[in-house]
Amino acid sequence: MAIKINEKGRGKFKPAPTYEKEEVRQLLMEKINEEMEAVATATSDISNDEIQYKSDKFNVLSLFCGAGGLDLGFELAGLEQSLGTDKALEAFKDRDVYNAIRHESVFHTVYANDIFSEALQTYEKNMPNHVFIHEKDIRKIKEFPSANLVIGGFPCPGFSEAGPRLVDDERNFLYIHFIRCLMQVQPEIFVAENVKGMMTLGGGEVFRQIVEDFGAAGYRVEARLLNARDYGVPQIRERVIIVGVRNDIDFNYEYPEITHGNEEGLKPYVTLEEAIGDLSLDPGPYFTGSYSTIFMSRNRKKKWTDQSFTIQASGRQAPIHPGGLPMEKVDKNKWIFPDGEENHRRLSVKEIKRIQTFPDWYEFSDGGNMKVSVNNRLDKQYKQIGNAVPVFLARAVAKSIAQFAADYLKDNHPHEAPQMKLFI
């Protein structure tokens, strides 16, 4: 099977040549070597003294942390492990109550890294103040803090089915630095998240190589496609969850059992009505403006009794609010609003935050630049929310790890704070 490879020329994309599947591995190896050579010239700018470890917790290192959806879900699962589900979920509704007990979680995040300023501003507003927040390109980070658990959703535009899918898109190789972190830190467990499209890029060869590369770092690796709506998220959102357990650790990770669905014995799917129905009178700010021909080429509006379309990292691409008449298909690639465009709007920031299962108290930064348009500032919030892992999906993924962590800490209680390890 031939695979498209990106070729740049004069600032534009030339027609892509084709490579056979056996050539993909060689291409990946070349890219890995390029990335490793680049990091060799980096300098360290953090010290172990700046990292606030806890010897009685499972210390967590977060890569590509974004606004903190994955981190918050893990913290919540760790709190449920310590205090019970009812108490943790009740506290989760209120910022002050949650902040007062969040330190009880078995997970303790010590470090978070990203390059997007607004996302890190959001992270700092909402996550514990002991976390060392590192705004730096991961390709220029020479050494990472020690941790028991490394988590992260490495950037995925190059894998996305929503746009061009080119094997050598440079964004496809940031996972190498996740693996570099694993080789240096050697955490007991890691969890990586990515889009569904990574499984089929290059006929599946790229995905197979990525899983193999993670395993080569010293881990037993599993990967599975999960749908967020199966775990109480009011949204159809499929994501690949890759979990690795260090080869010497006696733990077999179990993917979460489905909790929501139409089958007997499961809770019903959470609907848009349940998630955002109470916000109709006070939805908060939302992205305004016309709809493109591409946007109107398919249905963008769900019923109140449905789950949302996947929330995208764009205000302009936000789904339409479920109120009013449904959209109508009038041609092969053309849908309309039968009662007029003025009677419909995109989902608001507050609404998509709910759909991504963030609590209402979670504040998203818009960058604070009053010189740009309202839409521009709102789009920064939409982007953060759309890029995030739904909190309740992260919570489901984390539950069995939280149980393992609690048992592991009882049996392997460290007496000294871990030290940073330099990767050579």
Swiss-Prot record:
Q: What catalytic reaction does the record list?
A: a 2'-deoxycytidine in DNA + S-adenosyl-L-methionine = a 5-methyl-2'-deoxycytidine in DNA + S-adenosyl-L-homocysteine + H(+)
Q: Does the keyword Transport apply?
A: no
Q: What is this protein called?
A: Type II methyltransferase M.BspRI
- Which GO biological-process labels does this protein carry? DNA restriction-modification system; methylation; negative regulation of gene expression via chromosomal CpG island methylation
Where, by residue number, is the active site?
A: C156
**UniProt gene name:** bspRIM
Q: Where is the SAM-dependent MTase C5-type domain?
A: 58-408
Quaternary assembly = Monomer.
Q: Which family does it belong to?
A: Belongs to the class I-like SAM-binding methyltransferase superfamily. C5-methyltransferase family.
As one GO molecular function, the record gives: DNA (cytosine-5-)-methyltransferase activity
